[in-house]
Amino acid sequence: MAQGSGGREGALRTPAGGWHSPPSPDMQELLRSVERDLSIDPRQLAPAPGGTHVVALVPARWLASLRDRRLPLGPCPRAEGLGEAEVRTLLQRSVQRLPAGWTRVEVHGLRKRRLSYPLGGGLPFEDGSCGPETLTRFMQEVAAQNYRNLWRHAYHTYGQPYSHSPAPSAVPALDSVRQALQRVYGCSFLPVGETTQCPSYAREGPCPPRGSPACPSLLRAEALLESPEMLYVVHPYVQFSLHDVVTFSPAKLTNSQAKVLFILFRVLRAMDACHRQGLACGALSLYHIAVDEKLCSELRLDLSAYERPEEDENEEAPVARDEAGIVSQEEQGGQPGQPTGQEELRSLVLDWVHGRISNFHYLMQLNRLAGRRQGDPNYHPVLPWVVDFTTPHGRFRDLRKSKFRLNKGDKQLDFTYEMTRQAFVAGGAGGGEPPHVPHHISDVLSDITYYVYKARRTPRSVLCGHVRAQWEPHEYPASMERMQNWTPDECIPEFYTDPSIFRSIHPDMPDLDVPAWCSSSQEFVAAHRALLESREVSRDLHHWIDLTFGYKLQGKEAVKEKNVCLHLVDAHTHLASYGVVQLFDQPHPQRLAGAPALAPEPPLIPKLLVQTIQETTGREDFTENPGQLPNGVGRPVLEATPCEASWTRDRPVAGEDDLEQATEALDSISLAGKAGDQLGSSSQASPGLLSFSVASASRPGRRNKAAGADPGEGEEGRILLPEGFNPMQALEELEKTGNFLAKGLGGLLEVPEQPRVQPAVPLQCLLHRDMQALGVLLAEMVFATRVRTLQPDAPLWVRFQAVRGLCTRHPKEVPVSLQPVLDTLLQMSGPEVPMGAERGKLDQLFEYRPVSQGLPPPCPSQLLSPFSSVVPFPPYFPALHRFILLYQARRVEDEAQGRELVFALWQQLGAVLKDITPEGLEILLPFVLSLMSEEHTAVYTAWYLFEPVAKALGPKNANKYLLKPLIGAYESPCQLHGRFYLYTDCFVAQLMVRLGLQAFLTHLLPHVLQVLAGAEASQEESKDLAGAAEEEESGLPGAGPGSCAFGEEIPMDGEPPASSGLGLPDYTSGVSFHDQADLPETEDFQAGLYVTESPQPQEAEAVSLGRLSDKSSTSETSLGEERAPDEGGAPVDKSSLRSGDSSQDLKQSEGSEEEEEEEDSCVVLEEEEGEQEEVTGASELTLSDTVLSMETVVAGGSGGDGEEEEEALPEQSEGKEQKILLDTACKMVRWLSAKLGPTVASRHVARNLLRLLTSCYVGPTRQQFTVSSGESPPLSAGNIYQKRPVLGDIVSGPVLSCLLHIARLYGEPVLTYQYLPYISYLVAPGSASGPSRLNSRKEAGLLAAVTLTQKIIVYLSDTTLMDILPRISHEVLLPVLSFLTSLVTGFPSGAQARTILCVKTISLIALICLRIGQEMVQQHLSEPVATFFQVFSQLHELRQQDLKLDPAGRGEGQLPQVVFSDGQQRPVDPALLDELQKVFTLEMAYTIYVPFSCLLGDIIRKIIPNHELVGELAALYLESISPSSRNPASVEPTMPGTGPEWDPHGGGCPQDDGHSGTFGSVLVGNRIQIPNDSRPENPGPLGPISGVGGGGLGSGSDDNALKQELPRSVHGLSGNWLAYWQYEIGVSQQDAHFHFHQIRLQSFPGHSGAVKCVAPLSSEDFFLSGSKDRTVRLWPLYNYGDGTSETAPRLVYTQHRKSVFFVGQLEAPQHVVSCDGAVHVWDPFTGKTLRTVEPLDSRVPLTAVAVMPAPHTSITMASSDSTLRFVDCRKPGLQHEFRLGGGLNPGLVRALAISPSGRSVVAGFSSGFMVLLDTRTGLVLRGWPAHEGDILQIKAVEGSVLVSSSSDHSLTVWKELEQKPTHHYKSASDPIHTFDLYGSEVVTGTVSNKIGVCSLLEPPSQATTKLSSENFRGTLTSLALLPTKRHLLLGSDNGVIRLLA
């Protein structure tokens, strides 16, 4: 390049910056052809990185017409709306989001003229070979092939030279390729280009329809096109290739050989399909294998390998060099693509080290090798900043530190690293995925930085899309100084080459300022480039290379240099096409800038040093012309010139540091100019100074301060070397360079000469080359990090030589599974074949031997055969492959197709899971997850596939991977059809078993219950369920144990946010669902509180909740004190809950249930509540029950109304589907409530239902009155009290039905101790002074509270109602009325919500009045009633003061105070008057006055001061609708009948009948009239209530009853159960401690001998016990009676012959394992024995047994000869056996424990010795003397923790591989012979009947309780804990088991 600045500028003006290499001639030709033949705008085309094809940006419609084979193909439309820069960005690989309607395709081209050679050999395979392969056939084919190959080999060697037979027929390669492509891709070529009449079309006629491609593992072709000169294959764009996986996401394949083999399996399938059709795949590389997130690989053929190079093109033009041997810039720029053969990295490194190429050129080549792409915003080439612009004259930047480190400072990087390290450790300990990985640097050059750098040249739209959405041109750095200061990232090449980057294209953004020491951008670029080439930089550049591309990116060096990059250490498994790439793993050699270290002349002695420096100081001045700056590229000015002395040491001797630093950079520029002139003189002046100043160990270019001292002052005799001189340096550098070249770059490549000429190319030769390319590709995958330094377009033979060398040098790095296949494909064991570049492009690398190890040369079908041992493909691969192909083949448009697909997959899943390993599950799982998260398949996938997949995964992984998609399936409202499957009790039982009870209750149950609140519930409302828990937990104080008060159970379980711990991090990163679902879930939970996102702006719930705790807590305790004495004595408690024959009923119902269970194929033991059905004769719940139970109690209408409403139902619900869905869900909730028992049902089911009830009323739509066909509009004239349900009442029907069912099941305490306190919490005002502000959720809470109170009042007995009446008045009615009648509180939904609340409250108060009678109303309810009526007077007065009030109210900031006639002053919000007047109208006055005047009679005058005013208003209303009506106020209401009729305590009195509470039918005018036909004919003691059953709230008329009795249930709470339940619902779920109160709950007598072992089933509703009486019994854990009742076993297993000492459950298949010296496996549903394992020798019995955790199905048995044996239930015989003794005599194995992961087993011996064994390998990990006595029991806990107890009275906690115990507990009196674990606590039992609780984490401290003889008789023999229910099962030596809490 010319030296002048003009020439440089010319070169820099090229649009791409002038420094990156242009495309090769072949690529330019392909680009021109595609532009010409396909009419695609050249701006929409880009060469692919590998140089094999063109990427085109095309409209999707154009591509569709191409796919549909429409001819003629029109020109491709241009990207009109997009600028050139945007189009260029969209063509970059790392960009994934494209504008709508646009897509990218790959166009692969073949030049016809290069296919003119003959191609010999036909199809190598017969098509008939597609039947199932058998061993016989495989052997026959191998023998035939061997025979054929040996014959041919012999013929070629001995026969052919003498044979004169004609040459075998050969076809032109063009025809052969064209036909093979059509067969493989299943479509024919379309003519394109200038003449669409290609010769082949004349013959073939019109285009046939598209067929199917030969193999699904082959990348499909969108179209095959033919122009006169070219053949094109158009492929869909490949986003990620296998090269991206091994380069940027290597963790995707680590630790799993199955994944690598599966990719190979699919590639071989594709190659086999191509070879069968006679098509060679070409010189395959990692770039040719397309991979998606689920690791489904597709092969993309390398068609260019078919092209034979033309003769003239074969000769490469030699690179011109000038005399000094340096490649000049012009040649470098013009030489296409830097030809790989000549410029291999080795020579590149040497050229740079010796100064033959410039720094810039070398760094650009390193960028290219790392895959960095010009113009890619995410992966642009990166160069170092070399100058610090922040100082006035600039100074050199420290290249030993990364820019990130210089910018952020060491402190911040250390802080980042330490914080992420701590988070990583904490995350790892928690067992979930580590949230953070310790790192210092997040990115080297981010896309934001790239766009900011290029902001002046980038269109505004792009900047707004990437940098910041708002256009703020002045926010972008305005100068180089600010730019460099702002960014932690490195520089880009444009700042060294392109002056245009400084000039702005935006009118409102100024140009980028250059530093003050430059006058223009051209001058700056020239100076900047010169600085890059300066010797200061050259000498330190290798440090920067080590930091950016080299060994300092990983390991200890990276930590030391604070250079740990997140991308390299985060082990991410999502695919990426950019990242940080490490090229070198050895220290990079230093550039030998200046004179060599070993100079021809000796160095000067130190005495002269000071003198020389002082002499040279005066000789320096800055008189040079800065215009003569060399560009430092064209010649070796800076690198090889020995001029260092003239400036490096030109430094002030004193400490003038600032000046010294500030002038550094400028010095180097000015001095570089005269370097050439001083070449001779300066080196003669001080020859020795040069040689050691270069190698100075101090900061480059800076002299050591100590050099100023006189070194000659020391001892005379010692030889003093010059400062910084190292005589060994030259040798060390030589060693370093050699080491780097040998280890880092893989040694030398020899290129022997071997010319060859071959006429026709046999097809077999091409196919063999394919196999060799496959071998090279596999080796490149294995050695991915070592072959990064190969060029992407390196020829096959270069790649082969490289990988062959690597395989020889590093054989241990090749995985065992790939060693045989690499050896077969690359003939590693054979002699090394010398080969050269001139070997033809079409030749194979070497010839395979005709027979090798008995097999013919490798081909895909041979490698795929199950009978060939070359590749060890697991046996499940074919089934897995078929499963995936079926998944990919079906396109699902609707639900029917979705169901068909899932059903078909389900049929295949069994074959896949039969032999699958965990590695295989990793491949399968992403497909199942994406099915579970796609709309049309989610429900059916859950129904069909959840059970088998979760069974294979085990509970831990099922929670980790399947929980989130399950939540998605439950939350998706559009999935109505078939959704009821997910709510069947059978499916929910599977969920509980496979996820684990606790995980199901905590994470999934809230989402399951959501459906009850209506399918149309919005996402926000439904998510409130999860969040409300936290609000309530934070808003209310937890009541202490023992207090049974309103509100005590409100502290809800502190469930973690649904998203925490449920992320799906690992192999599922391909599933799109999770990426979307993560966002809202995580965002909604801020600081543990749920922030609602509703359409209207509203207060966060937490605001009012915080305030409401003060008031409610005081009332809670006071109520508890009053109520407590009643607990035992209330009549409901004992007498009514136990029917005499309930046990008889139970037996009958249990029998029928078991049949149902078997029909339902349920996997779980369950006990439906048949008992209640027997007792109460209830019917099933139907939807009509649920919907009609919504009406307000004081409602009615005639029977006709009810019928009309039933007819209107289908319109109200969403038809039959919705009805089935709600029916199924209600039935399931009823079943679940009984199954879970009272405490768990109250904590999890009831609490969630109560929260749901509020969401049923949220939003204005739910607050509309429902108008059925025959009904008048709201509050119409005439018949005032009608059925007035709002939509929310209909929606809340199923929720109320389920809530009342729980009350029926467990009795009245549920209403008074759980529901009423929750109601008082809902309605409590937010602060002590007056009502709080309402938000829409609080408003809905008020409506829900009043509705639920109404339901509860009906079911309360008279005594209970009277007991809690004061509380209802003060804690429910008055707070509701304070909101309703408030003059300052507005309702978010305005008058509508207030009107509904008003109507509901009237109904509620009227209901209570009817229940308690006039006297009690006067005594207890006068205040609420008076408050209600008072509001009319207040509004009346306000209306009169209206004029005076308004101006005052508007003027002040605070609310005006108004004095009312009662003398009180109240604040009034003038803005609310309108709302209040809309609600409290004349009509409302009439609505209130008439019923209360009837109900209260004369008392109304005593308790309602303003009754006359309200009466007048009511009269006005009557006049307005019918002027002739009488004034009701003037007429005394006449009471019907006599007093006793209103006596609430009467037996069968009228209020029990269906109509007495329904004013619509009873009010005639203003009289209450009881219709004759409504009286029951024979009302018994239960009256009409007997019809009300477990189904729902019965019929509509029952629903209007004033009082209904709760039916007696065998599960009703009384006695100890009631006391324990009251305590338990008040305890916070956050409490992780186990509290033992010795409350006796149930007894299980039946064993005739001592109970040896007890084991609860995982669902905690049944448990197993084994005894000395040789039986195993299965017991139900449902609550009965008051704590004194006894329960009979459900099943007795009697097949044992000796005493049973072990019983447990195999979780995966749900079988029971019990042992009496022989192991029995049996079915708990039927009691049938499935398998018996007898000891091999009766003299060596089994002494200990343990079952492996799910998903394993093995049993581990220890025999008395210290041998461990493993049995798999699915297979006959033993799996394997391991010896434990090992020469010692540790005694008998007493106890076995298996770690929760199943990876290790620990055995405890009678001698106190313990042995830890790896279950996978059988290796003994550790053996140690743990105790001094017999080991009694061992348990293994998560986190590799073991707990052991011994007869030496100790209990010890161990870490698996640590020598010392972490905790040691000593029991004083007796040894701990039995214990169980609760979280991080151990619950222990001793022979002296003491129960202790001690912690695994905290220092030893133990709380012990002695069991009282009243609660536990006999001696404690065994103990088991129910973790969810928090109960203890204690077995005794007298055969009785007791349940205590």
Swiss-Prot record:
How does the protein associate with the membrane? Peripheral membrane protein
**SUPFAM superfamilies per the record?**
BEACH domain (SSF81837), Protein kinase-like (PK-like) (SSF56112), WD40 repeat-like (SSF50978)
Altering G282E: what's the impact? In HYC3; uncertain significance
Could you tell me the keywords of this UniProt record? Cytoplasm, Cytoplasmic vesicle, Disease variant, Endosome, Intellectual disability, Lysosome, Membrane, Mitochondrion, Repeat, Transit peptide, WD repeat
Provide the GO MF annotations for this entry.
K63-linked polyubiquitin modification-dependent protein binding; phosphatidylinositol 3-kinase inhibitor activity; phosphatidylinositol 3-kinase regulator activity
Q: Which disease is it linked to?
A: Cerebellar ataxia, impaired intellectual development, and dysequilibrium syndrome 2: An autosomal recessive, congenital cerebellar ataxia associated with cerebellar hypoplasia, intellectual disability, and inability to walk bipedally, resulting in quadrupedal locomotion as a functional adaptation. Additional findings include generalized brain atrophy and mild hypoplasia of the corpus callosum.
Which Gene Ontology terms describe the biological processes this protein takes part in?
A: aggrephagy; early endosome to late endosome transport; mitochondrion organization; protein stabilization; ubiquitin-dependent protein catabolic process
Main location per UniProt? membrane
Compositionally biased residues, Gly residues: 1586-1595
Q: Which PROSITE patterns match?
A: BEACH, WD_REPEATS_2, WD_REPEATS_REGION
Q: Where is this region: Disordered?
A: 1-27, 618-637, 694-718, 1022-1074, 1097-1217, 1523-1556, 1569-1602
Please indicate if the UniProt record lists Transmembrane as a keyword. no
What organism is listed for this UniProt entry?
Answer: Homo sapiens
Under what name is this protein listed?
WD repeat-containing protein 81
Pfam family example for this protein?
Answer: WD40
Gene3D superfamilies in UniProt: BEACH domain, YVTN repeat-like/Quinoprotein amine dehydrogenase
